[in-house]
Amino acid sequence: MFLHSVNLWNLAFYVFMVFLATLGLWDVFFGFEENKCSMSYMFEYPEYQKIELPKKLTKRYPAYELYLYGEGSYAEEHKILPLTGIPVLFLPGNAGSYKQVRSIGSIALRKAEDIDFKYHFDFFSVNFNEELVALYGGSLQKQTKFVHECIKAILKLYKGQEFAPTSVAIIGHSMGGLVARALLTLKNFKQDLINLLVTQATPHVAPVMPLDRFITEFYMNVNNYWILNARHINLTTLSVAGGFRDYQVRSGLTFLPKLSHYTSALSVVSSAVPKTWVSTDHLSIVWCKQLQLTTIRAFFDLIDADTKQITQKPKKKLSVLNHHFIRHPAKQFEENPSIISDLTGTSMWVPVKVSRWSYVAYNESDKIYFAFPLANHRKIYTHAYCQSTMLDTNSWIFGCINSTSMCRQGVDLSWKAELLPTIKSLTLRLQDYPSLSHIVVYVPSVHGSKFVVDCEFFKKEARSMQLPVTHLFSFGLSSRKVTLNTNGLYYNIELLNFGQIYQAFKVNVVSKCTGSKEEITSIYKLHIPWSYEDSLTIAQVPSSTDISLKLHVAQPENDSHVALLKMYTSSDCQYEVTIKTSFPQILGQVVRFHGGALPAYVVSSILLAYGGQLYSLLSTGYCLEYSTILDKEAKPYKVDPFVIMIKFLLGYKWFKELWDAVLLPELDAIVLTSQSMCFPLVSLILFLFGTCTAYWSGLLSSTSVQLLSSLWLALKRPAELPKDIKVMSPDLPVLTVVFLIVSWTTCGALAILLSYLYYVFKVVHLQASLTTFKNNQPVNPKHSRRSEKKSNHHKDSAVQSLRLCANDAEDSLRMHSTVINLLTWVVLLSMPSLIYWLKNLRYYFKLSPDPCKPLAFLLIPAIAILGNTHTVSVKSSKLLKTVSQFPLPLAVGVIAFGSSHLYRVPCFVIIPLVFHALCNFM
């Protein structure tokens, strides 16, 4: 039936939309670097010792447990409590296991062994029963309260110890990080119980999929508390995102709110973390060896030697985190580093007067100081740049104040350096150091190892170039190019007009080298100055290297910085940089940032088609095919202008006051604008994707009904069309009451699913009856739709008595097809709470709180009546004219209020369905 109404042009359009959506999905799920994380290994068998909690607590939280992680002899020793280390609590996230603590716990244990257990950490982990808290937010508050009790229980294990801790450090993965932040919102919680919070791939800004009001309210409470109490929160917090490999939680959601008066929070993407430099997926972030090593190094540097616990000094905490996660100078962390260093001993001093210098050190027996006098260089150049391939942690570059060619003391400039994968580098603006007479590079004595030191002086203008990015709608057909003609070591390319999340580019760097036959490495670093989301690309030159340019966080309105492509190059090579728009990556950004809103646009399109069918039934007496009416009615100009107009009017104070007076919720478009997520044409693109999805879902549901009806006819004797229409069949009240009882006593989503299956059964039965009727009737061309319209116009006696004919059955099936599509999305959006309930059935028979219960009490009776509804009874209703007007404003409402709050979408669906059901009685 559905296939007969397919228009080839429309079909081609929908196929094209599928192609575009596939490009975007491919970029999200496959368009990133390979997994470069090293696996972390346990050298001894991991053990999880269950911590006994008070019986009252276990009764209140029967599904939750607390464990202590250990290995080998450490695990054996600590089976006899109390403990003597530094407590760290790991909180797993959505569907996460308490055993995920083993990677970081094992690395911390090995580090403690290296220092003979001078300090060591005790890693605890909470078992949340792998609850799906990203899908159902009703248990988040319960988890938060349990963690509070766990912290108190952990600290009791250290009672009586000489250096007993008074607080714990928390590492939270995914939603576990949000639960940790929520601790501060508890009435009886003391903030001093947490000394450090590290979150990994935690969506702090908003839920990934707001599928129920509980998760949205939880986010609102947590974020509002942190914003309103920012001055009083002295908890040092680090949020680490996974980058583009993490398609479950996009990195933009992990950035903590930036408040001018709250400076104890850092947010960084793993690709920008020194000594990590890789993107991680949502699960590998807990076992990625590079990242866990960085985390543990920071933890050990945070220890206060006097208390043998994590320091209570906020300034030191931030210094340590900046050192390890933001900018690493290739030196061991020191709280108060000595700026002045002694340059003494029997070292050789060599003056260097050239502007470009390179030294290859191999089997050096003597220490050498290379001194670069600055007097002449200051007249010509603005900057000095040095790099070394020796990646040890010793000081290697100094500044002399003496005017002579050698000095006894120098300013240690090594703290200004930056560690990169293959080099450590330092760039100095000479005017910032007017008192320096020399720059001194120190080359230690080495045996058996080889490294290279390079230095050069340059003018900023010669090494800084501007490269305007190509236009969004160039679709990769045009490009812009810049050539690095000078043979320098370091270049800055300013990427002008690049600062929006919808922008995406492909950069190609071609290097051509002469002279050296040795393997040469170049580093290309994308630096985003308004957020720590840098990424590095290492290339062996000569080569042609592609780099993807796209953002996790848009540039703030008041930020004037420019994104940079920093190039650490070889003086033997020339480089050509080409940039062009990447259309597939733009589609990927649309899917990445707005894919979660697609169900709202799908339902909006179906509602428009539904309204068109009701109006067709009112005006012509028959119902159009779903695909035909979808093509006719699902137009973006029926929805978007209203949303844009409302958003515009909300900018006026009088309209905003009126809006608040009638208690309307905040417009979703305003929420997206506040998160810098609104960009041109995104609503149009999403509407087209939504209409395309509605079309293919309609095709799928229609095909499924026909297949099920064929199966029905194969298994059962042929059914007949009912001779009398009975909206209230004898079994209807019983089924309705049963489903309502199921909803009240177990789970609302379960009752909705059962009602949906009942409705599908009724439609399949009607389809089977119609098929049987057609197979048994001779083909008679006189009985056409036109003749039926004529008979309807003359109020034929069969219609007057509401006799159901084959054409009326076809009309009913067309209407049922649309209703099934609407109900399918309602069921899909309610499924998360059902899955959560099924998973926790052994602990709780009744889901509480239940986000779907109010919806179920309205939807179940409506579905029961609609299952027995035929168009012949609806089109004679006085209520039909009013009902046919509902879907259009509701389609607007779905986009206005449901695109960022998906749990509201079923509420807009249920209204026309209830009134449609009432048409049988009015």
Swiss-Prot record:
<feature type="topological domain" description="Lumenal">
    <location>
        <begin position="33"/>
        <end position="597"/>
    </location>
</feature>
<protein>
    <recommendedName>
        <fullName>GPI inositol-deacylase</fullName>
        <ecNumber>3.1.-.-</ecNumber>
    </recommendedName>
</protein>
<dbReference type="GO" id="GO:0015031">
    <property type="term" value="P:protein transport"/>
</dbReference>
<feature type="transmembrane region" description="Helical">
    <location>
        <begin position="818"/>
        <end position="838"/>
    </location>
</feature>
<dbReference type="GO" id="GO:0009948">
    <property type="term" value="P:anterior/posterior axis specification"/>
</dbReference>
<feature type="glycosylation site" description="N-linked (GlcNAc...) asparagine">
    <location>
        <position position="402"/>
    </location>
</feature>
<dbReference type="GO" id="GO:0005789">
    <property type="term" value="C:endoplasmic reticulum membrane"/>
</dbReference>
<dbReference type="GO" id="GO:0021871">
    <property type="term" value="P:forebrain regionalization"/>
</dbReference>
<feature type="topological domain" description="Cytoplasmic">
    <location>
        <begin position="916"/>
        <end position="922"/>
    </location>
</feature>
<dbReference type="InterPro" id="IPR056824">
    <property type="entry name" value="PGAP1_TMD"/>
</dbReference>
<dbReference type="GO" id="GO:0007605">
    <property type="term" value="P:sensory perception of sound"/>
</dbReference>
<keyword id="KW-0472">Membrane</keyword>
<dbReference type="GO" id="GO:0016788">
    <property type="term" value="F:hydrolase activity, acting on ester bonds"/>
</dbReference>
<feature type="transmembrane region" description="Helical">
    <location>
        <begin position="669"/>
        <end position="689"/>
    </location>
</feature>
<feature type="compositionally biased region" description="Basic residues">
    <location>
        <begin position="782"/>
        <end position="793"/>
    </location>
</feature>
<feature type="transmembrane region" description="Helical">
    <location>
        <begin position="695"/>
        <end position="715"/>
    </location>
</feature>
<dbReference type="GO" id="GO:0160215">
    <property type="term" value="F:deacylase activity"/>
</dbReference>
<keyword id="KW-0378">Hydrolase</keyword>
<dbReference type="GO" id="GO:1902953">
    <property type="term" value="P:positive regulation of ER to Golgi vesicle-mediated transport"/>
</dbReference>
<dbReference type="Pfam" id="PF24660">
    <property type="entry name" value="PGAP1_3rd"/>
</dbReference>
<feature type="topological domain" description="Lumenal">
    <location>
        <begin position="663"/>
        <end position="668"/>
    </location>
</feature>
<feature type="topological domain" description="Lumenal">
    <location>
        <begin position="716"/>
        <end position="733"/>
    </location>
</feature>
<feature type="topological domain" description="Cytoplasmic">
    <location>
        <begin position="619"/>
        <end position="641"/>
    </location>
</feature>
<feature type="topological domain" description="Lumenal">
    <location>
        <begin position="839"/>
        <end position="894"/>
    </location>
</feature>
<feature type="glycosylation site" description="N-linked (GlcNAc...) asparagine">
    <location>
        <position position="558"/>
    </location>
</feature>
<keyword id="KW-0812">Transmembrane</keyword>
<dbReference type="GO" id="GO:0005783">
    <property type="term" value="C:endoplasmic reticulum"/>
</dbReference>
<feature type="transmembrane region" description="Helical">
    <location>
        <begin position="12"/>
        <end position="32"/>
    </location>
</feature>
<comment type="function">
    <text>GPI inositol-deacylase that catalyzes the remove of the acyl chain linked to the 2-OH position of inositol ring from the GPI-anchored protein (GPI-AP) in the endoplasmic reticulum. Initiates the post-attachment remodeling phase of GPI-AP biogenesis and participates in endoplasmic reticulum (ER)-to-Golgi transport of GPI-anchored protein.</text>
</comment>
<feature type="topological domain" description="Cytoplasmic">
    <location>
        <begin position="755"/>
        <end position="817"/>
    </location>
</feature>
<keyword id="KW-0325">Glycoprotein</keyword>
<feature type="region of interest" description="Disordered">
    <location>
        <begin position="776"/>
        <end position="798"/>
    </location>
</feature>
<comment type="similarity">
    <text>Belongs to the GPI inositol-deacylase family.</text>
</comment>
<dbReference type="GO" id="GO:0060322">
    <property type="term" value="P:head development"/>
</dbReference>
<feature type="topological domain" description="Cytoplasmic">
    <location>
        <begin position="690"/>
        <end position="694"/>
    </location>
</feature>
<dbReference type="InterPro" id="IPR012908">
    <property type="entry name" value="PGAP1-ab_dom-like"/>
</dbReference>
<keyword id="KW-0256">Endoplasmic reticulum</keyword>
<feature type="transmembrane region" description="Helical">
    <location>
        <begin position="598"/>
        <end position="618"/>
    </location>
</feature>
<dbReference type="Pfam" id="PF25141">
    <property type="entry name" value="PGAP1_2nd"/>
</dbReference>
<keyword id="KW-0653">Protein transport</keyword>
<dbReference type="InterPro" id="IPR029058">
    <property type="entry name" value="AB_hydrolase_fold"/>
</dbReference>
<keyword id="KW-0813">Transport</keyword>
